[in-house]
């Protein structure tokens, strides 16, 4: 077994142990610069996830619980999110974040909404990259916290960009089964939120619509990367977050989104 340490946005870390050298090497690459090999003494006391290669998949050990998976990278991502879920100084949103004129623009959506393709398109158009899949917010300041990971794109998303004449630098990762893209321009400092877009793909229309505060709160309830306890503190935080500029963004054309971001 080899163990690596992954540093988290709250300055703590988790340990990931595995007997699979390809898995360890892919994690070291995917979580760089926040990841490194651990010495024997360093993993002691840290939240630890063990992934033992077996029968074409992995036996996952987390505390006293064990399960089998064929998706080790999702297990690592979910483990990190669960570990951070108890940190009341952070809030995790499912979406992508980019910078424009010193402010963060957040694109929030469920999986399959095209947010990865959209984020990569905007990066190729010159907007600095902040996050994709998991956006970290500081609850006290509502600042978006940078915590770099590359973009993971499916084949179909890359095909969309190729049809638009874009050819982002990418490499196919056999273990991730994704194209890995490192955007050229990256924002590495905390930024305030300029606007949050709740995005929906459409075959026929481009529209950006205002949202009432109750509508914003309802949408934000479905936006976190993990399930949070539905208590008074959490609802009060969401009410504060809902005061930001929020729009429903229905889009067919990617350049329509670019124009919305710039105006």
Residues covered by each model-derived region:
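Pre-Walker A adenine-sensing motif
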Residues: 85-100
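N-terminal "assembly arms/tails" that initiate or stabilize quaternary assembly
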Residues: 29-33
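Acidic-aromatic/histidine active-site loop/patch
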Residues: 34, 38, 160
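Charged, amphipathic alpha-helical linker segments immediately N-terminal to NTP-binding catalytic cores
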Residues: 39-82, 254, 262-263
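Post-Walker A alpha-helix
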Residues: 118-119
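Short, P/G- and charge-enriched loop/turn segments at secondary-structure junctions
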Residues: 83-86, 182-184
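Conserved lysine of the Walker
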Residues: 115
């Amino acid at each position: 077994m080899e163990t690596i340490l992954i540093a988290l946005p709250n300055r703590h870390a988790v340990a990931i142990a595995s007997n699979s050298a390809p898995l360890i090497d892919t994690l070291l690459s995917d979580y760089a610069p926040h990841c490194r090999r651990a010495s024997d003494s360093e993993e002691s006391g840290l939240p630890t996830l063990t992934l033992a290669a077996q029968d074409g998949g992995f036996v996952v050990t987390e505390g006293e619980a064990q399960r089998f998976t064929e998706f080790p990278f999702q297990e690592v991502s979910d483990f990190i999110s669960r570990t951070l879920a108890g940190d009341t100084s952070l809030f995790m949103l499912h979406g992508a974040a980019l910078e424009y004129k010193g402010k963060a623009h957040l694109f929030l959506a469920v999986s399959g909404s095209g947010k990865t393709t959209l984020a990569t398109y905007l990066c190729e158009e010159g907007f600095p990259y902040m996050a994709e899949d998991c956006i970290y917010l500081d609850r006290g300041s509502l600042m978006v916290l940078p915590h770099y990971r590359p973009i993971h794109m499916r084949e179909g998303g890359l095909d969309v960009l190729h049809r638009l004449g874009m050819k982002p630098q990418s490499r196919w990762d056999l273990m991730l089964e994704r194209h890995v893209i490192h955007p050229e321009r990256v924002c590495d400092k905390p930024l305030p939120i300029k606007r949050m877009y709740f995005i929906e793909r459409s075959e026929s229309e481009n529209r950006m619509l205002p949202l009432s505060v109750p509508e914003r709160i309802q949408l934000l309830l479905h936006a976190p990367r993990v399930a949070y306890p539905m208590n008074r503190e959490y609802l009060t935080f969401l009410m504060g977050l809902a005061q930001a500029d929020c729009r429903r963004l229905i889009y067919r054309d990617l350049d329509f989104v670019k124009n919305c971001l710039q105006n």
